[in-house]
Amino acid sequence: MVSIEYKEADNNLNFTFNGHLDTNTSTWINESIIKELNNRKGSDNPEEKADFKVTFDLLDVSYISSYFIRICILTAKQVKPGNFRIINCDPMIKKTFKIAGLDESLNVS
């Protein structure tokens, strides 16, 4: 089973995921993230950069699909440069971001 939790703290919006983030589950995850970002920004204009920080916590994630990587890229584009990060990656997931050349631009740790 896949789940996603949202927490707001100060100027941070934290998303905690768990499970197997394959293409099927990533569809509703994407919709949930977009909804939450738009609510927080007060706008659904993708060109408008959010002023808050976004963190994806992948501590309990066992797999990510290319669709989830796309979600990470699109979310990072919704906030100002440096305001997106991915934390608590499994070593194999971190390697996936590194192979894709996204580990630094998405602040993967």
Task: For every predicted segment, state its role.
Residues 1-16:
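Short beta-strand/loop segment at the start of cytosolic alpha/beta domains
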Residues 21-105:
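Amphipathic alpha-helical interaction surfaces in cytosolic regulatory modules
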Residues 107-109:
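Short acidic-hydrophobic, aromatic-tinged amphipathic segments that line or gate anion-handling sites
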